[in-house]
Amino acid sequence: MNTIHLEIVTPEGLIFSNDAKMVVLPGSEGEFGVLPGHASLVSLLKIGVVDIENVDGTHDAVAIDWGYVKIDENKVIVLVDGAVYVAGNSESEIAQSIENAKTLVKRMSDGNGILATALARIENAARAR
């Protein structure tokens, strides 16, 4: 099976690193998906949620603020100022990561539309777990 390697990096360090079937990113001009073999490009990212379709078909989510993405045929590197991986081994850990993600998005958002969209994506990602 073809996969693409995704890394999400902040000034604090590596937030996420794994192979995926597909990655959906919040580009400055709208969301876009990346599959293995994608054309190389560099793009600006806005506040939102990176949706990751894992090799086993499950989905992960990482809330991000602004940054950049560099895409090659088999690798996606996301460089952002802040990110929160929405995950956990218990309900309380997942709830805490959701709150952290909401705080990140609210801190960086300057528009109610962007805020509402990002918060809805975070909630949906958490429900899918």
Curated annotation (Swiss-Prot):
SUPFAM superfamilies, alphabetized: Epsilon subunit of F1F0-ATP synthase N-terminal domain
Cell location: Cell inner membrane
A Pfam family per the record: ATP-synt_DE_N
Keywords, sorted A to Z: ATP synthesis, Cell inner membrane, Cell membrane, CF(1), Hydrogen ion transport, Ion transport, Membrane, Transport
Molecular function as annotated in GO: ATP binding; proton-transporting ATP synthase activity, rotational mechanism
GO cellular component, one term: proton-transporting ATP synthase complex
Signal peptide range in chain numbering: none
UniProt superkingdom: Bacteria
Membrane topology value: Peripheral membrane protein
NCBIfam families the record matches: ATP_synt_epsi (TIGR01216)
PANTHER family (UniProt xref): ATP SYNTHASE DELTA/EPSILON CHAIN, ATP SYNTHASE EPSILON CHAIN, CHLOROPLASTIC
Family: Belongs to the ATPase epsilon chain family.
Subunit structure: F-type ATPases have 2 components, CF(1) - the catalytic core - and CF(0) - the membrane proton channel. CF(1) has five subunits: alpha(3), beta(3), gamma(1), delta(1), epsilon(1). CF(0) has three main subunits: a, b and c.
Function according to Swiss-Prot or TrEMBL: Produces ATP from ADP in the presence of a proton gradient across the membrane.
Protein name: ATP synthase epsilon chain
Species this chain originates from: Campylobacter fetus subsp. fetus (strain 82-40)
